[in-house]
């Protein structure tokens, strides 16, 4: 039975030093079974992304701008998975629900900053495909290792700076009563609702920053793929058009899935009273797990050069 840290009688005097995470309150007896698919997805995400990183690092033929961007995406996926899933599994397996005040806000910062970093990486990769298909002769002079280095710095700095105020503002609130978070993770709104203060500023900043970052990235992604589609439809060689549509189509579908599930999570958090709590919690967990599991498959394993790189590494190991 989960007990809050302070009772109503002393909630105004006893500060909160840790939080308790409650996962799927209506399915407590099913948590061990729920952990099985989550564990498999976690192992898939970690294994696939680690394999992709090692392959790109060790195979000299993959030391190219696009694959460096794939490495960045895999690194972001690994950090996101390690930030969220081990704690969720610890709750399921060992009932370790407590999370310290600093750890909670560190998790919040990583989640809030790394998800926009992923969308920004998708945007740069979409631009890479746009240049490769629409301006193939200029591709080597535009998409260089120096370009990727600058883009990577921009991705990290922009999102870290603009999302840092979210956990900072939330941590500055006073927590002096209920300490049970109705979630598996330290989501900003789930934590803010436990504070004794008005957190309107937090909600406004998260909304503006989140939609500014994600909205601008998604707009540029869709714009890039619009130009790509227009260029592909003009291809005279049918085989080239089919190949380009197959590759870029799978990328676009994955990005669409990523943005859709993120939009659903945001909307369900806003309308949380109309959405079953367990559904809301499940969505919060899955949108940190499914994209990291799918990214290396769609962007990596389906790529001929990546397959060849993995085969070479396996042959060396024999």
Curated annotation (Swiss-Prot):
Keywords: Cell membrane, Disulfide bond, G-protein coupled receptor, Glycoprotein, Membrane, Olfaction, Receptor, Sensory transduction, Transducer, Transmembrane, Transmembrane helix
Keyword Membrane among UniProt keywords: yes
Side of membrane Cytoplasmic, spans: 54-61, 128-146, 225-244, 302-318
InterPro entries: GPCR_Rhodpsn, GPCR_Rhodpsn_7TM, Olfact_rcpt, OR51/52/56-like
SUPFAM superfamilies, per database record: Family A G protein-coupled receptor-like
Record bears the keyword Membrane: yes
Extracellular side: 1-32, 83-106, 168-203, 266-280
Domain of life: Eukaryota
Primary location class: membrane
Membrane topology annotation: Multi-pass membrane protein
Disulfide bonds: 104-196
Glycosylation sites recorded in the entry for this protein: 10, 188, 198
Protein location: Cell membrane
Molecular function per GO: G protein-coupled receptor activity; olfactory receptor activity
GO CC terms: plasma membrane
Parts of the chain that traverse the membrane: 33-53, 62-82, 107-127, 147-167, 204-224, 245-265, 281-301
Family indicated by similarity: Belongs to the G-protein coupled receptor 1 family.
Role this protein plays: Odorant receptor.
Protein name: Olfactory receptor 56A1
Species in which this protein is naturally found: Homo sapiens
């Amino acid at each position: 039975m989960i007990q809050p840290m302070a009772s109503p009688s002393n909630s105004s005097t006893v500060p909160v030093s840790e939080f308790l995470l409650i996962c799927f309150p209506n399915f407590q007896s099913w948590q061990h079974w729920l952990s099985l698919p989550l564990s498999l997805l976690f192992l898939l995400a970690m294994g696939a992304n680690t394999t992709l990183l090692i392959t790109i690092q060790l195979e000299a033929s993959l030391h190219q701008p696009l694959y460096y961007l794939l490495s960045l995406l895999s690194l972001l996926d690994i950090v996101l998975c390690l930030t969220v899933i081990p704690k969720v599994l610890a709750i399921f397996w060992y009932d370790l629900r407590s999370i310290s005040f600093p750890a909670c806000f560190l998790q919040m910062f990583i989640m809030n900053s790394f998800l926009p970093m992923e969308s920004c990486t998708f945007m740069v990769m979409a631009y890479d495909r746009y240049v490769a298909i629409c301006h193939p002769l200029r591709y080597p002079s535009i998409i260089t290792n120096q370009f990727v280095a600058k883009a990577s710095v921009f991705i990290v700095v922009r999102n870290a700076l603009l999302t840092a105020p979210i956990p900072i503002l939330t941590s500055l609130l006073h927590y002096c009563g209920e300490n049970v978070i109705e979630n598996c993770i330290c989501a900003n709104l789930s934590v803010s609702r436990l504070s004794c203060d008005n957190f309107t500023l937090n909600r406004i900043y998260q909304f503006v920053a989140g939609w500014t970052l994600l909205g601008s990235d998604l707009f540029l992604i869709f714009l890039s793929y619009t130009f790509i589609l227009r260029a592909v439809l003009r291809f005279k060689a049918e085989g080239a058009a089919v190949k380009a549509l197959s590759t870029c189509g799978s990328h676009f579908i994955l990005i669409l899935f990523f943005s859709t599930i993120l939009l659903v999570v945001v909307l369900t958090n806003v309308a949380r009273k109309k959405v079953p709590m367990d559904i809301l919690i499940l969505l919060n967990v899955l949108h940190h797990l499914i994209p990291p599991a799918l990214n290396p498959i769609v962007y990596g394993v389906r790529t001929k050069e990546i397959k060849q790189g993995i085969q070479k590494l396996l042959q060396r190991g024999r």
